[in-house]
Amino acid sequence: MFKGKYLGLLVVAAMLVLIAAQCGPPPTPETITVVETVVVEKEVQGETVTVVETVEVEKEVVKEVEVEKVVTVEVEAAAPAKPFEGVEINVLTFTGPQIAEPLQRRGPDFTELTGATVNVIIVPFSDLYQKILTDMATGTNSFDAFVFAPQWMVDYIVPGYLEDLTDRIAADPDIEWEDVAPFFRDFSASYEGRIYTIPLDGDFHMVYYRTDLLEEAGLEPPKTWDDYLEIAATFHGQDLNGDGDPDYGSCISKARAQQSYWWITSIAAPFIQSQGTSQGVFFDPETFEPLVDNEAFARALDIYNETSQYGPPDELNLNVGDTRSLFTAGRCALSLDWGDIGTLAIDPETSVVQDKVGAVITPGSTEVLDWETGELVPCDETTCPYAIDGVNHAPFASFGGWSGGINAAADDKVKDAAYAFFSYMNQPAQSNVDVTIGKTGYNPYRTSQFLNRQAWVEAGMSPQAASNYLGAIENSLASPNMVLDLRVPQNQRYQQVVLDLALSQFAAGEITRDEAIQQIYDGWEEITDELGREDQLNAYLGSLGAN
């Protein structure tokens, strides 16, 4: 959209006709003979008469000549006005530093191109959803645009708070919309066939492992969650980075009011969903009853709790930034995370595990839930039609990838500028670089970002590591049993409030596993009854593509 600076020199060639006397030294006079006609009186036969005669006369003259001279004049053309000169865009996102970093870094470049000033305002993640909702719902409209979790969009779209971006994107060739991977383009960015957000990030959970440790021990990367626990137990307490201190078999962030509540879905998913994406993992698609009071979710809670035995002693207080730092410091054999560790691990300034990190699709299970009995049953061709070597995988498209949305109540010129900024951030020239930098928190979401492995090699990955990292994400995207995030009205209350609280209390030993299950079940049912079961069920089925 904005590809260059408009400044140049206009060269004007002018043909000027100049009088020699005005353009050079005065010419030298010269004497010439001319013929003139004169009238004279003469005596003719004694009479005076007037006659006309022709005579030669010498005169001193100065000749006037015309000369042509080509003069080249250089004129500096005025730069065209920048389209958003004087416009300010207030963009709200979370503290980070990831996610906000590329917005802050590229904002001045966008200002140079367009004249618009980009102000990035940050708040803690736990406050972001409500801050956005309150600002628009109350008509305060302090913020013109937002970078947020696309699963929240339903609560902003239905009341008319978010700008519909469909027509803008259709008229914007620079965004190369068809290059955005179908899942992020057609699901994460869209609602009921209209586009409301611009992806800046692509999110899937993966498991990371130390390739050097597993190779030395003769172990394969984990295929099941039981494998994960066995590998974690094997390496826990060993010195994994050569500094003489014992390290950890598993590092998973579990701090409350952060982003920890998503992990339990990745663990529970392969036990619950086996019949394809439209089956879902959160609610019964016929009754909208929570899918937590069963052996599958109970098993997931047991696994979640056991991973803490092989983690740092303060794991319940760690956020994703903390566990990522531990992994790149060589202190963790395994970790569950989004795509960030893959790029953070190649940073020579912060990582001691360069070219020692592998990534795999999240582990699966050889047992799945019988939805009629609530019990776990073995995988077979019927119960697990998408199993690989007897293992049912259900990769979780958790969070959907940080995305940009625009306040529909903002001034038209500000909305134009905000769209231009998000388009600029999304365009390949910027995004293909940003997704290879660990500190951005942005993971690949364009098809070209998966196909062009050279960009990753140039960023510091070995060809094998790039293939491994991108392959794990591609395997997740291509899975027919992919798990979609919860996208019903007020999903934030179901997950970030009820689920997060119960998990943190369970992990801290404040409540038992069964009490945690009951607390989640009751909390979700209360929200559903308040909002209307039929409406919530229809929204849920619509989000799964099942209605």
Show where each model-derived region lies:
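Short, polar/charged alpha-helical segment
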Residues: 78-83, 96-118, 499, 517
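Extracytoplasmic "Venus flytrap"
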Residues: 83, 87-105, 125-126, 203, ...
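Extracytoplasmic/periplasmic solute-binding protein
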Residues: 187-200, 205, 229-289, 332
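Glycine-centered hinge/linker elements that transmit conformational signals in sensory
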Residues: 232-233, 279-317, 358-367, 377-383
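C-terminal lobe and pocket-closing loops
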Residues: 343-352, 365-497, 501, 536-547
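Hinge/lid segment of periplasmic solute-binding proteins
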Residues: 79-83, 150-205, 220, 229, ...
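Short, well-ordered beta-strand elements
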Residues: 34, 85-96, 116-121, 144-145, ...
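Extracytoplasmic "Venus flytrap"/periplasmic binding protein-like
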Residues: 105-180, 212-223, 333-334, 349-352, ...
